[in-house]
């Protein structure tokens, strides 16, 4: 697994929920609801791992994987 970093910042100006940068930086808007956060995190990580995939594949599999994990009960928990 190649190195990647996750940064949380508001992405309103970019009109995005998440962004992937070629240097391995994944940015996620911290205001996302839990299920949307899961989908966006997976979506951006898929861009990292499968750079050759078309956006339609990333969208499809990001949604499928996040739906599967949600059904299993995976949730984001803030421990702050």
Question: Where are the model-predicted features located?
Answer:
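Metalloprotease/metallohydrolase-associated module, dominated by Zn2+-dependent proteases
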Residues: 1-36, 50-80
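Active-site recognition of the HExxH zinc-binding catalytic motif
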Residues: 39-48
């Amino acid at each position: 697994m190649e190195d990647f970093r996750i940064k949380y910042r508001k992405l309103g100006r970019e009109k995005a929920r998440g962004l992937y940068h070629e240097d391995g930086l994944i940015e996620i808007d911290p205001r996302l609801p839990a299920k949307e956060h899961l989908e966006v995190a997976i979506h951006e990580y898929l861009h990292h791992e499968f750079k050759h995939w078309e956006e339609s594949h990333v969208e499809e599999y990001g949604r499928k994987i996040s739906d599967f994990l949600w059904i299993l009960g995976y949730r984001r928990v803030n421990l702050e």
